[in-house]
Amino acid sequence: MEPDVLVVGAGPAGAAVSILLARQGYRVLLVERATFPRDKACAEYLSPACTPLLAQLGVLNAILAAAPQRLQGMRVMDYRGRSCWGRFIQDGQCLYGLALPRLVLDHLLVEQACREGVELRTGFWVRQPLLDGQRVCGVSGQQAQYRETVRARLVIAADGVQSTLARRLGLVRRIHWLQHVAFVTHYASVHPMQPWGEMFLIPSGYIGLAPVSDTLVNVSVVVRAAHLAATQKTSQAFFAQTVQTHPELRQRFAQAIRVKNLLTTGPMAQRTACPQQDGIMFIGDAAGFFDPFTGQGIYLALHSATLAAAVAHRALCSGALSADDLRSYFLAHRRAFRDKYRLSALIQLGLRMPWLANRVIDRLARRPSLADIVVGVAGDFVSPKTVLSWRFATQVLL
């Protein structure tokens, strides 16, 4: 039987929207190229604002049972080696972020989707959208060696930053000056391990650390794509040299052992234009990508899924699935994340001026209450408008 909704991509965004629509009684087919459990290149950090969304999806208890690390806030070290700390704190109450492997998180979300009645098909490689005039009515893809088409009333693309559907429909808009490449892996025996997300600024980008278990640390290196190309080094050699040449990390990694393959993603920095075709929506990274220094990809995934599910429910009930009818989701998405995009762009500009980055971090180190506000924005529970104001800028810069 033809599904009401075809969701492409079973990451957090795809699994979340599938859960929400299945609860409304729709027949949902969720297709994924990989098989589970599967890993992803990700900082593996869930901001405090993710917690109520995970509870809404019915997976919070399962995630807490998986023993995630509870992060108290974030630390940022500037180019000179000076650090500022910001806590996850709101109205005097301490909050926390969660960190756990995507291998675990994605599997728990997909299991919940299946419990809600979602049909899951793994190993299905989507090749292109299926078009009926100006309407996207499904996808054509491949399962093992067999070509196949799948039709649905509504297609929701949750197929990530390299979205096949966005590219095939000509909707990808590259942000060339923000192109980065990310390398991610896990290390054991990093000393000391900190209950914080940590960011270390380096001339070409930054290094991120976050504990994901009692013994493992997620280590991410994010660099400008042009810088990586100019080094002419292999990914493995570049990653190892970048970590080992940082003064603090060289000491903390003296006994460390890499315990996972090095994962790579990028170049990344793009937005997806509002579809002109009927019958399709884009969520998560497929709808546009923040630089991970300020963006919180998993929160974006879950929140955009919530926005999309509400619009999709109204559209499916009324049968109004044209591009104009679905545009309300695009506008809601833009309202929800526009200021975070603006802040991301400003921070990336600042990171290209070490003197400015050093000045800001020095001020935040001297005024911890301001650092708490910045970290609250990164944690998705303080509005980006707070730090985009002239008043806040003068407090940090003057």
Predicted regions and their residues:
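Beta1/beta-strand and adjacent pyrophosphate-binding region of the FAD-binding site
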Residues: 1-13
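Glycine-rich FAD pyrophosphate-binding loop
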Residues: 22-42
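Residue-level detector of alpha-helix initiation sites
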Residues: 11-12, 36-37, 104
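A conserved beta-strand/loop capping segment in the N-terminal third of enzymes
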Residues: 56-107
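Conserved N-terminal glycine-rich FAD pyrophosphate-binding loop of Rossmann-like flavoproteins
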Residues: 35-55
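C-terminal helical "tail/cap" subdomain of flavin- and related membrane-associated enzymes
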Residues: 313-398
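Predominantly flavin-linked oxidoreductase catalytic cores and closely associated redox partners
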Residues: 112-249
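FAD/FMN-dependent oxidoreductases across multiple families
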Residues: 66, 229-311, 315-317
